[in-house]
A protein has these predicted regions:
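Bacterial Sec-dependent N-terminal signal peptides
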Residues: 2-8, 14-45, 235-236
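Short, ordered, surface-exposed loop/turn motifs in non-cytosolic proteins
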Residues: 43-67, 150-155
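Short, acidic Ser/Thr/Gly-rich low-complexity loop/linker segments typical of extracellular
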Residues: 63-79
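Short Pro-Gly-centered beta-turn/loop motif in secreted/extracellular proteins
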Residues: 74-78, 83-93
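Short strand-edge motifs at loop-to-beta-strand transitions and within beta-strands
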Residues: 80-82, 114-116, 185-193
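Structured interaction patches on ligand/partner-binding surfaces of diverse proteins
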Residues: 98-123
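Beta-strand-rich modules
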Residues: 200-224
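Extracellular fibronectin type III
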Residues: 222-235
């Protein structure tokens, strides 16, 4: 008799859980989408960012008028854009954090696909020029801090066999980093002599012999980036 009661209780609990699951399944899926760019307040162009991930730029949205106390956060891409297709329609405040000073938070009504750009000032802007000669690539740079009081601590010239490139381990294959305090500089990579090129030559060949270069500059404890430049190597 006791065993029968236990079985009945278990069956009842299972039925309750199944009913609750059915109720959850009846909720409509999110129909909203927010997308946009973190735009340089002066140039109007997207701010180049670190690789998308935990060490990159974060966009946070908070629903307004619902009593929500927890923001929903997601990562911006290294080209300065972002997109989140898993939100409900409604009113939101939008903020972002990264190697820039955000020019106030935004407020947007999400209705279907909704654009919401953010205005920001990076700590520095980086101009990069690349000249190629067969298997060699010469990268030159100019770093311009956005405030006269900002000092450039260190500058990096990076290359990678994937487009996702920044100063974090695993996000670059080779680098030239002895530009301490420099606002200008250049370096020539002879890729066929680079150890990581030799170690990853098959991957590079599968990707059309492409490698990617980028400049990073540390200023006020934050690292800003140039855009990523693609090189197609000619080893003939």
């Amino acid at each position: 008799m006791i065993m029968k009661k236990i079985i009945n209780i278990i069956l009842l609990a299972a039925a309750v859980l199944m009913a609750a699951g059915c109720e959850l399944d009846n909720y409509d899926a999110p129909q909203g989408c927010i997308y946009g760019s973190i735009l340089d307040a002066e140039t109007g162009k997207p701010v180049p960012l670190p690789v998308e991930g935990t060490t990159g730029a974060i966009v946070s949205i908070m629903e307004v008028g619902t009593g929500a106390t927890l923001a929903q956060s997601f990562y911006a891409k290294q080209d300065g854009t972002y997109r989140n297709s898993l939100i409900f329609e409604g009113d939101y405040t939008v903020t972002a954090s990264g190697p820039f000073i955000l020019q106030g938070s935004g407020q947007v009504t999400v209705n279907g696909e909704t654009r919401c750009d953010q205005s920001a000032v990076p700590y520095s802007r980086i101009e990069m020029n690349v000249a190629q000669d067969g298997m060699k690539g010469t990268v030159s740079f100019t770093v311009t801090p956005t405030d006269d009081s900002y000092k450039v601590k260190k500058t990096y010239i990076l290359w990678n066999y994937r487009k996702q490139t920044d100063i974090q381990n695993g996000n670059f294959a080779g680098s030239k980093t002895d530009f301490t305090g420099s606002k200008t500089g250049s370096h020539t990579f002879n890729f066929e002599n680079e150890v990581q090129y030799k170690n990853n030559v098959d991957k590079i060949a599968e990707n059309g012999n492409k490698v990617y270069v980028r400049v990073a500059a540390e200023c006020e404890g934050r690292v800003n980036y140039s855009e990523v430049y693609e090189l197609t190597l000619n080893n003939n």
